[in-house]
């Protein structure tokens, strides 16, 4: 059978590295046929982390990081294809998200910025590359995010149940797939970002593996209440957020004196905050039908988070996308392969019910090989 392969490439707010996956669109539904990961080089991660945390840089530095990211994507793709015995001619197109460095969808001059020079990606791989997916949605009045729910709808929706796909990356976002209703999707809260930043500050680790550190801590109710008292949670959907809100500076403002607490107690509280802020939103969506929560992203491998979701959502079946045929670490990368497929065929790939756009459009800028 003839294959119709597209390569999705994603690097998220966690800055851990580059996810890559190949989707075969000759299959119905499309099938994930290969996936891989390239760690972010430490020097590039440090520069990106500083840029994300401060929002400040020089044009010279920004241009250099843009170039370095483009090279990282290109080299990651070439190595990935070689490892899976694929050639450039096997791939119809690449869908590459780029690296978000700022997302500001509100105000008089809404904008979003993803960097990583896609001219380098197309030139170095010899594969047509699709990128810059978010700005056209914003140009027609949308938030530019989230883009993945349209893909979730095609893969996971069922007329028999309410399905919510929860992606726990740096930020937590959901796709709400309700029978006979338009799909909606939006950012609901922080994901791993605060927990990752906190353990990096105190233990120089990138993340709290298996919640081992958080499990040694004790919940701080007063801090939890303060964190949950955040105006973002009261905003109507669709809405989007990022590290420009949920960061260590925000955390410090939410507590009179963070240093008065044991760091592990703060970590346990941040884990609980991540769960409860999401659960509060999910409970507003509960229906009489069966309710299924499908978790994906790095946070779906956190046993403490998954345990607390199960405990706080007794009416829901709580599972991961692994159990439904899509590796939890590669759902977003798979979505960008789908977005590229739609763009190449000039099909719409945004959902106005999700982003708030005035009309459906075909997102993505084409960089020919």
Curated annotation (Swiss-Prot):
It holds the Pfam family AnmK. Its EC number is 2.7.1.170. CDD domains: ASKHA_NBD_ANMK (cd24050). Signal peptide: none annotated. One of its GO terms (molecular function) is ATP binding. It comes from the Bacteria. One of its GO terms (biological process) is 1,6-anhydro-N-acetyl-beta-muramic acid catabolic process. Keywords: ATP-binding, Carbohydrate metabolism, Kinase, Nucleotide-binding, Transferase. ATP binds at residues 12-19. Belongs to the anhydro-N-acetylmuramic acid kinase family. InterPro entries: Anhydro_N_Ac-Mur_kinase, ATPase_NBD. It catalyses: 1,6-anhydro-N-acetyl-beta-muramate + ATP + H2O = N-acetyl-D-muramate 6-phosphate + ADP + H(+). It is an enzyme of class 2 (transferase). This is Anhydro-N-acetylmuramic acid kinase. It comes from Actinobacillus pleuropneumoniae serotype 5b (strain L20). Catalyzes the specific phosphorylation of 1,6-anhydro-N-acetylmuramic acid (anhMurNAc) with the simultaneous cleavage of the 1,6-anhydro ring, generating MurNAc-6-P. Is required for the utilization of anhMurNAc either imported from the medium or derived from its own cell wall murein, and thus plays a role in cell wall recycling.
């Amino acid at each position: 059978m003839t294959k119709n392969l597209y390569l999705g490439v994603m690097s998220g707010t966690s800055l851990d590295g580059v996810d890559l996956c190949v989707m075969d669109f000759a299959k119905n539904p499309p099938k994930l046929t290969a996936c891989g990961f390239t760690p972010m080089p430490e020097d590039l991660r440090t520069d990106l982390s500083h840029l994300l945390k401060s929002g400040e840089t020089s044009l010279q530095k920004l241009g250099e990081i843009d170039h370095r990211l483009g090279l990282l994507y290109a080299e990651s793709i070439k190595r990935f294809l070689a490892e899976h015995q694929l050639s450039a001619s096997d791939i119809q197109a690449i869908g590459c998200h780029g690296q978000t460095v700022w997302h500001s969808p509100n105000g008089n001059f809404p904008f979003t910025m993803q960097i990583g020079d896609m001219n380098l990606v197309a030139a170095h791989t010899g594969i047509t590359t699709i990128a810059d997916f978010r700005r056209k949605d914003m140009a027609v009045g949308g938030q530019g995010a989230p883009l993945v729910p349209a893909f979730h709808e095609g893969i996971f929706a069922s007329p028999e149940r309410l399905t919510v796909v929860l992606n726990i990356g740096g930020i937590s976002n959901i796709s709400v797939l309700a029978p006979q209703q338009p799909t909606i999707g939006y950012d609901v809260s922080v994901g791993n970002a605060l927990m990752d930043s906190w353990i990096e500050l105190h233990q120089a680790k990138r993340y709290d593996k298996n919640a081992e550190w958080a499990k040694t801590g004790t919940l701080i109710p007063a801090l939890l209440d303060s964190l949950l008292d955040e105006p973002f949670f009261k905003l109507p959907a669709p809405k989007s957020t990022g590290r420009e809100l949920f960061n260590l500076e925000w955390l410090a403002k939410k507590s009179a004196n963070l240093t008065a607490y044991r760091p592990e107690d703060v970590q346990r509280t941040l884990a609980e905050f991540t769960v409860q802020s999401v659960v509060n939103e999910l409970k507003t969506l509960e229906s009489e039908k069966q309710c299924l929560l499908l978790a994906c992203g790095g946070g779906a491998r956190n046993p403490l988070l998954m345990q607390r979701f199960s405990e706080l959502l007794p009416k829901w079946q709580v599972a991961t996308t692994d159990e439904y045929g899509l590796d939890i670490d590669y759902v977003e990368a798979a979505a960008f392969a789908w977005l590229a497929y739609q763009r190449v065929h000039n099909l719409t790939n945004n959902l106005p019910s999700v982003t708030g756009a005035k009309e459906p459009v075909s997102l993505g800028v084409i960089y020919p090989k």
